[in-house]
Every structure is written in structure tokens, then in C-alpha cells.
From Swiss-Prot:
Belongs to the class-I aminoacyl-tRNA synthetase family. Glutamate--tRNA ligase type 2 subfamily. PROSITE patterns: AA_TRNA_LIGASE_I. This is Glutamate--tRNA ligase. One of its GO terms (cellular component) is protein-containing complex. The keyword Ligase applies.
Amino acid sequence: MDGDIEHLLFIYALQNAVKHDSAPKSGTVIGTVLGKHPEFRSRARELGPLAGKAVAQVGKMSAADRKSRLEALAPELLAELTETHEHVRKLPDLEGAENGVVMRFAPNPSGPLHLGHARASILNDYYVRRYGGRYVLRVEDTDPKRVDPDAYAMVLEDVEWLGLGITDIVYQSDRLDIYYDWCRKLIELGGAYVCVCDSERFRELKLKGKACPCRELTVEENLELWQQMLDGEFYEGDVTVRVKTDLAHPDPAMRDYSAMRIVNAPLHPRVDATVFPLMNFSVAVDDHLLGITHVIRGKDHIANTRRQRYIFDYFGWKPPVYRHYGRMGISGVVLSTSGMREGINSGLYTGWDDIHLGTMRAIARRGIEPEAVRNAMVDIGIGETDISFSWENLYSRNKELVDPKANRYFFVPDPVEVTVEGAPRREAHAALHPNDPSRGVRTLVAEEAILLPRADIEGKSMVRLKDLYNVKIAWDGDTPRVSYAGDSLEEARHEKAPIIQWLPADAKLPCTLLRQDGSLEGFCEPLVAGETDRVVQFERIGFARIDSADGGRVSAYFAHR
């Protein structure tokens, strides 16, 4: 097992050195290995010395030696540098990152990850790989009302699918005693107090910039109330711990915000507790204790950054370097976790991977590769300007990846069965991939009846059947009469006859192509049944992932043109 890890560390150190034409960093190499081989995450802390050894070996090699050694040991990694990475945008430098970074991705386990999560997770991962260091997956599960027990596993699965180089996994619900301790310390500093005011009364005072009576309690009185909270002597809504801020702050939401509260129901799925921190308190404590150096997140968190700075200032902690990127509008899919859950429960959606949703598992089911998502998010970058997510760019990025791999097949939607009058028996030999003859060909035999796509022949007087011959079409109302019109491709071009796909009527499989705007029913080549869980190209239609081929029926999900 150690030999496997050492080999992986060495080849990825080589790849990093060739890519950047400089000596690699241990943290970057470790992040890459853990992102591509999550089975080693449980041993993340053991990798430092092994990575150091690999980096030292590579550092002594010349640029030419590095490249030739990489080509000998892992030619596919060298190919990645020329095929894909040369097209990936380089993001701006991070201040103070020269000696490595510690960054975090902090989802709430309310459901699976979606495109919004993907942006945050990928941008942070990008910089950890670039500068080296640690990448913490921090599951922020301190609000029982927003925790879905099934989401814990879904988040880990989605993180693995995205290939994030996670080095540490932290569950905030495991750290409640830590938050309790720091809350007590904050009270002792005079930076927080226990408030038993009615919430509406407190709101009225806050809007007027006035202190509530609880703000004047002594440290001893506050500590006694805090202990009563922990002992279960209060109930939900009775009490909260507030951080002392500026009652004259121009933004009322900044004035004495809540840090701790009681939640009696629902019960937390992982811990037996009723006192939980609110996000800004637990995040500030964790960012300090976990050594987070840089935080990249949306500008909708700018106010939270200001709240968290109060905690850092009270304790004299150095805050991370913050970068806030602009909002990303995403059209065409559902992203609201509550909306998705309601739709699933009502039967509107088939599950979290329904193609109308913006979850990672829905994206994956359509045949979008994780590297395409990564590249698309890096293309968007960390700018502060609000933008709209470009599906076309994601599809373009995915096409770069799947086009060289996807075998070609015919799919005939809404078929019309015809007999071509005067046609000879003919075998069509169509390449599985036009740029890779070694894959071989598909053989389609045209004799007697064939299937043609209705939409492609309606109103046409002549078409060319791809890899076969030309046919003329005469119409008797809605009924086509089809006759053989020779083999000449030049004649078809001269007549501007469209080239369409077709199938033998006696060699086909029923196929459903599921799309966001409605399904297509038709038939595909029998060989498609062997492509389950792979992306193929249905010629003239687009790329699709073959989801299943059970009971003689193919189910496919449309990816893009």
C-alpha cells in the first residue's frame, strides 16, 4: 500500500513540476492525490514525509528529465497538460499565500451539493492545489432544523465526485463543547451576555439603538444564566447569548447579534444537545482553531465577515484573508433545497438526481464530467461582479472531455418505418469514432424496412442516409413513399439533401432520451446496450449518458449538443 502511495505522490509531483516548470510543493501534491484517490484520505496525515521525499526527488531533476520520466511512468498525466490544462484560466494571486494556505469548504447538510456549492468548493480547491497546504471539509450542522440525516453521506459522495483534495473532515456537531468553552470565555471578557428579553421587545430596542436590560448584567450573572442554559433550565425562544457590538452601527443587523440559542425540536441526528451556536460564532471559532488562512466565498457573506470580525477582535485573533466573489445567477434548474425536497416528496421530481435540478448528482447523471464543472467554475473566477452562469460554457468544457471518448451511434426519434423501393441490400460500416479507427466499426444492414426520423424527412424530397445511400421521398398526404436514388455523395450535396440517421427495422432497441424540455421516444442501435454509464454521441442529436439498458430497453439522459 505504501508503494502505491509513494508512486502516486511521485508521478503527481512530476506532473506539477512539468506543468509549472518549477519544483512542486508537498501540499499541492498531497491535495492532488487525495482529490483523485479519496481512498487514501484516512491516511492524509501520514502523507507529509512521503510527499516531501517525492518532491525532493523531483526537485533534483532537470526539466527535460521530469518530462521524459512522466511520459514513461504516466503518459496520461502528461497528455492532460496538453489536452485540457492549457485551456484553464489562471486566477489572481492570493495575498499572503506564498508559504501555503489552509482553506475550507463549509456546506450545511440540508441536502446534496448543487452548482452554488460547486463554485465555492472548486475555487478554494484551486488555490489549495496552487499554493499547497490543507483543505478542510467543515460540515456546518449546528442547526437541527436544517439537517437532513441523509445529507451527510450525500455531501461526502459529491465531494468525492468533484475530486476535491480534502485533507481534513470536521463536523461542527462534534465540537459543541469547544463552542461552549469559547462562549464562556467571551462572556468572561465582557464581549457577550445572556439575553432573556422577548424577541420582539429586543428588536424594538435594537432598531432604536438602545441597550436591553440584560446588557447591563454582571459577568457573574451572565455566567450563571449561561450555565442554566447548558443545564436545560430554559426552553427554545426563552434565551439567547448575544455578542456585544456597536448599538449605533448603521446596519441594525450588526447590533448585538445572537451567538448561542436553544433548539428543543427537532432532535439533532448526531448529538444529544439543545444548546447550539449560530453560524457566525462557530465559524469564527473554527476558522481560528483550524488555522484557516484564506476564506473565499460569495459577497452575500460580507455582512457575516463583519460579524465574525467582532469575535476575532475580542480574542485578539488574526483573521483570515477574505475574498468575496459576486453572485452567480443560475437559470434553467431548481437550486432551492426546500423546493427540491418538496418536489421530490410530491412526485414532481424523481429524486435528487432529477435532470431538472441543479445538484451535482443531477449534473453527473446527464453525463457532465466533474472536470468540466471544475473548469467552468475556474473560468468564472473570483471577481466581485455579479454574473450569470453559462450553461454553454459548461457544455463546451464537457465536450472537450467527452468528444474524444464517446462512441458514435444512431438514434431515431419518432420513427417512420419505410421500405426503400429499388434499393439493393447494403451493409453500412460506420466508425465507432471518426478519429480513432482502432475502435472498429458498427455494421448496419439495410434490407427491406428501415426506420427514419419523422421530423427530418417531413417536407423533404431527397435525403441522404448517413453511411448508406440517397433516397427520394414522394408524399401522399402524411405518408412518405421512399425510393433509392443512388450512392453519390456529390449528388446529395448538389441537391442540398440533408444527411440523416437511420436504423434497420429488424435490428433496433427501444430508447428513451430524457431531456429537460421533454423526452424523446425512438430506437437506437443494439450496441448501445453495452454503453451503460458511459457517454455516447447520438449522431446529429448530441451527447447522452446511457443510464440503463434493462429488459431490452435503453434509457439515456441528454447532456448537450
